[in-house]
């Protein structure tokens, strides 16, 4: 185990929609990497139970995607509450990174943070105020060197742990191709 203030916390959520005021978190996963993006540990992958009335608020894209992946069924069968998910995730993070030092890392991570702020504020407070958002590099690459984007593709399973692994791989790709480090 390598507890360090240099470690990075990667998070991904799956939600019933895009508005934290009306939609809910249905899956959370986390990974801790070192500063060189080597995976040190994978946290719990948790389907968060939500009642049928919350699942009914999903649009067609969410319903189709989360049903096809098996996530809707996992959510229905889950006994994990939002608070349980917070407690289990923090318990994992405390073994690897001190509170308040790691930026929240991921792809379009601002959206996830909005949901954490609304539905899991205790977990949101575990992160530094900064973001490490891979999608920022993607947007800059799309504008300044679009041919580089052809060299990386995602599976797009929209399962939280898979999405984190892809985000880490994508950042490694940009480091090697754009930054040449």
Curated annotation (Swiss-Prot):
The active site is at 129. GO terms for biological process: DNA metabolic process. GO terms for cellular component: cytoplasm. Keywords: Cytoplasm, Exonuclease, Hydrolase, Nuclease. InterPro entries: Exonuclease_RNaseT/DNA_pol3, Oligoribonuclease, RNaseH-like_sf, RNaseH_sf. Residues 8-171 form the Exonuclease domain. Its main location: cytoplasm. Pfam families: RNase_T (PF00929). It is found in: Cytoplasm. Gene3D superfamilies: Ribonuclease H-like superfamily/Ribonuclease H. One of its GO terms (molecular function) is 3'-5'-RNA exonuclease activity. Its EC number is 3.1.15.-. The keyword Hydrolase applies. 3'-to-5' exoribonuclease specific for small oligoribonucleotides. HAMAP family: Oligoribonuclease. Belongs to the oligoribonuclease family. NCBIfam families: PRK05359.1. This is Oligoribonuclease. It comes from Vibrio parahaemolyticus serotype O3:K6 (strain RIMD 2210633).
């Amino acid at each position: 185990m390598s507890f360090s203030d240099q470690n990075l916390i990667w998070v991904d959520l799956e939600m019933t929609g895009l508005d934290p005021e009306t939609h809910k978190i249905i899956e959370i996963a986390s990974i801790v990497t070192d500063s060189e993006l080597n995976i040190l540990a994978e946290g719990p992958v948790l389907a968060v139970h939500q009642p049928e009335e919350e699942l009914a608020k999903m649009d067609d894209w969410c319903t189709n995607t989360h049903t096809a992946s098996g996530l809707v069924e996992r959510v229905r069968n889950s006994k994990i509450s939002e608070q349980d998910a917070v407690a289990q995730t923090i318990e994992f993070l405390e073994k690897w990174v001190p509170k308040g030092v790691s930026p929240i890392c991921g792809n379009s991570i601002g959206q996830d943070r909005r949901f954490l702020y609304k539905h899991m504020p205790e977990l949101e407070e575990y992160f530094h105020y900064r973001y490490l958002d891979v999608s920022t590099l993607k947007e800059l690459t799309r504008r300044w060197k679009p041919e580089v984007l052809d060299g990386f593709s995602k599976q797009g399973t929209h399962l939280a742990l898979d999405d984190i692994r892809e985000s880490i791989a994508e950042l490694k790709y940009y480091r090697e191709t754009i930054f040449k480090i």
